[in-house]
Amino acid sequence: MSIVGMRKFMQGKMQYVMLALAAVMAVGIVGIGIGSGRGGSVQDDSSGVMAKINGEKIERQDFETQYQNQTEQNQGNLPSAFEEAQARGRLFDSIVDQMIKVQAAEKAGVKVGRGEVKKKINEYINMRISQLKEQALANRKGKKTDEAFEAELKRSGMSLAQIKTDLRKAIDPKMVQDQLMIQKQMDKIKEGIDTSDRAVKASFDEIQLAQITVSSKTRPMAQAEQRAKDVLAKARSGESFAKLAGQFSEDAYSASGGDQGAFVRKSNLPEELASTLFGLKAGEVAGPIKQADGYVIYQVKDRRNALPADFNDPKKRKEYRDTYVQQEQAIVQAKAESDMRKNASIVVNDPEIKGYLITKNIGSYLGPDGGVRAKAKAKEAIKEFEKAINQSSGNSQALARCYSQISYLYYVMCKTGLLSPTPQEKIDFRKKGIDSVNQALKYTESNDLRTLLADLYIDDKNYDAALKELKYVSDNEFYDYNVHMQILGKYEQMKSARPEIVAQRIADEQKWIADYEQRMKEAQAAQEAQQAEQTTKPFKVNPGSGG
């Protein structure tokens, strides 16, 4: 068999396995195998501990191997260094969530037997085989028999027995056990939901609200709190809430006397706020309730029960009950998971992961201080990435990830007003951003990074350097329409600075965009023509498809 023939044979063989494994990955039951590890940790000590969750270790080698298993499912679609950093961070988050849930289940005394694990594994395998069979015989006329499915598999060099074997090997019984424990624990938590008619009817209770907002944007938070307390005292003493809103409120509702207008249900509000407000009678007030940018005082203007007219119809009542139960289960599960995470002891040792976690939560620090805390957190994240760089021992992938993330942080700090940089800080952040991108490009190639670099050069009025980066990206980006639209926009920014060069560059980009749009039209027409002539063909699965 020729090399080309062998490659085609292996592609045909693997497409079934890859498709089948995709669904297994989706439910998180593929085990940690032994692999070389593409990502590369920031530390050489592969036996080290990345983190401890309530005292339980996340071993570095286990993490790297699991990341390797994850990336193997995306062959041919390798991420950029920044995307890889995000993927590694998300994997860490998912591992932590899984560990916390399993620990909670163990603490609650949840048990799962071997028979339950074996049964669930067989269910997963049978489910995937059924889905594969349905796809394999989608264009077949007549009965979709097991024999016909086997014949289709044979044409691609596979057998049903082999697929089942490969699937079974890919499933880690311990992870199946963990999933079952988590499910049992959640089912146990949900058992406490009141599903009586009274509870279902109460879910249709609605309140109409008015509010007074005392902002901390123009005063310290402590002063905002005291002002809100003074206004609340006036409201409780009998003064008109609408007049107080018109006089003191600092939000869009002040013109309407604080009236929000529409009625809301308990499920439309955050749990704690809903519990407070739905415990009030019409005309009563509550507060002051702290928000990110001040304090809010609420008044329940009116109450009503919006029970549907057809509620007493048995069929409709069942539908309403089912919807209510689903909503309550989702709320209870979300709260349980939030409480588990909130009460967990999470100690992270890996500086790259530390930097990721800080960066991910920077938005939560935006508030009335003009972005001071958020900016401090961004700098803290940069320090962690720098620490990771120092510990990388020259690992090029780890260096590319860390420098990429530092680049984006400096870019955000100098390009957005959310973090309120001073004029000098903008200059400093821009220069550090340029340096960081250039460092990242020593270890990775990325059109996204080069486009970001060009943007920083434009702000720095280094137009020649910006033009060079944009030309490189344009010449090497063959498929992404949006990238060429970005390039066109950046050339427009430099029209007056380098008119003799930019005019031709704009024309080139416009031509690329027009040619691309024409190719897309032709491809669409060809696809429609092919679909019109579609006849029964051998089963072919896109390896990237999950089902």
What are these regions, as identified by a protein language model?
Residues 1-89, 342-547:
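Short, low-structural-confidence N-terminal segments
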Residues 2-7, 64-91, 106-203, 218-223, ...:
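Charged, solvent-exposed helices and adjacent loops that form client-binding or oligomerization surfaces
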Residues 49-53, 285-291:
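Short acidic-hydrophobic surface loop/beta-edge motif
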Residues 57-59, 140-146, 287, 298:
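A sequence-level detector of short linear motifs
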Residues 65-90, 165-191, 195-237, 250-271, ...:
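Well-structured core secondary-structure elements of compact alpha/beta domains
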Residues 68, 72, 96-113, 117, ...:
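Sec-exported extracytoplasmic/periplasmic mature domains
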Residues 149, 153, 316, 321-322, ...:
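Extracytoplasmic/secretory soluble proteins
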